[in-house]
UniProtKB/Swiss-Prot annotation:
Taxonomic lineage: Bacteria, Bacillati, Bacillota, Bacilli, Bacillales
InterPro entries from the UniProt entry: DUF5502 (IPR035131)
Species of the source: Listeria monocytogenes serovar 1/2a (strain ATCC BAA-679 / EGD-e)
One matching Pfam family: DUF5502
Signal peptide region: 1-20
Name of the protein this chain belongs to: Uncharacterized protein Lmo0206
UniProt keyword list: Signal
Length: 107
């Protein structure tokens, strides 16, 4: 009886995990654009600014991806209006911390 209960619990957990993976794959296929942005292409990233950390030689640089990864599907579904589109275009940020020698090492 105890083994039967554990077996049922195992199958329920397995089914939930498989359903979660299936849902994530469906969302990725239907919403996310397959073409990745190219960080080496300067037209696709925009520098928002940089600042120096006080009492150190380190700087923080802020970048934004110009391309909205959800733009096509949002426009098709009529989800995004013009104001939301402007905000969504700046929704992905890249932060780079560097020092006088280049990119800072993790500690």
């Amino acid at each position: 009886m105890y083994i039967k209960g554990r077996l049922i619990f195992f199958f329920v957990v397995l089914v939930i995990a498989l359903c979660s993976v299936l849902i994530l794959l469906i969302i990725k296929i239907s919403v996310w654009k397959d073409e990745p942005f190219h960080l080496s292409d300067a037209k696709e990233i925009e520098c928002l600014g940089s600042c120096e950390i006080k009492n150190t030689n380190q700087k923080i640089h802020f970048f934004s991806i110009k391309e909205n990864l959800f733009e096509e599907k949002g426009d098709i579904a009529g989800i995004l209006n013009e104001d939301e589109q402007k905000v969504a275009d700046k929704s992905i940020f890249i932060v780079i911390l560097d020092d006088e020698k280049g990119i800072a090492n993790e500690e």
